[in-house]
Design a protein with these regions (language model features):
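Helix-to-loop junction immediately C-terminal to a conserved catalytic motif
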Residues: 63
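Conserved ABC ATPase signature
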Residues: 149-153, 157
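The feature captures the beta-strand-to-loop junction immediately N-terminal to the Walker
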Residues: 48-50
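Catalytic Walker B motif of ABC-type/P-loop ATPase nucleotide-binding domains
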Residues: 174-177
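Conserved ABC transporter NBD signature motif
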Residues: 71-79
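Conserved catalytic motifs of ABC-family nucleotide-binding domains
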Residues: 170
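Short coil-to-helix segment of the ABC ATPase nucleotide-binding domain corresponding to the Q-loop/switch region
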Residues: 109-117
Length: 179
């Protein structure tokens, strides 16, 4: 049985230009060099490497946050380079779950509101939001923390909150940039 293709990468290249204040020239740093791969539904893929080797750059590309220098990224068959910025934002909000190294929890929101945020942005019914948050909080051992602010919980608890937030909309793809 063939599985559905979620992500396809063709000849992905990402370079950065480094401009130095004490020099007249600029240097091009080649981070990703011609990557090709496919990710199918229900497939787990791990990307490992030394610090600074391009793992986060790759995840930002796969998450449609950063555009490649060249090459193609297809998400569920759609060529990301042909999509408008609002279409990319919709895909990121509805179909891709992110867990970042720094979590990016909003301290002005409670743990519950942070988990619920993707559903609220997607204009999901309020009762569904609360039901889903409570279910995820229960599964991840966070129920007792729902009314707390992110700055009141431990690093491990923040990571679990970020994971719940990434899963809450049942995305097609989950990207986790963790140490």
């Amino acid at each position: 049985m063939n599985k559905r293709e979620v992500m396809k990468v063709e000849n992905l290249v990402r370079n950065y230009k480094m401009v130095y204040s004490n020099r007249q020239d600029e240097e091009e740093i080649k981070v990703l060099k011609g990557l090709d791969f496919t990710i199918e539904e229900q497939e787990f893929v791990g990307i490992m490497g030394k610090s600074g080797c391009g793992k986060t750059t790759l995840l930002k590309g796969l998450g449609l946050i950063d555009k490649p220098t060249s090459g193609k990224i297809f998400f569920t068959g759609k060529d990301a380079s042909e999509l408008w910025s609002d279409e990319l934002a919709d895909i990121r909000r509805r179909e891709i779950g992110f867990v970042f190294q720094d979590f990016y929890l909003l301290n002005s929101l409670s743990v519950k509101e942070n988990i619920m945020l993707p559903m609220v942005l997607d204009k999901a019914p309020v009762d569904k939001c609360y039901k889903n948050v409570e279910a995820y909080a229960e599964n991840f051992g966070l129920s007792h923390l729902l009314e707390k602010q992110p700055y009141e919980v431990s690093g491990g608890e923040k990571q679990r909150v970020a994971i719940c937030r990434a899963l809450i909309n049942n995305p097609d793809l989950i990207l986790a940039d963790v140490n």
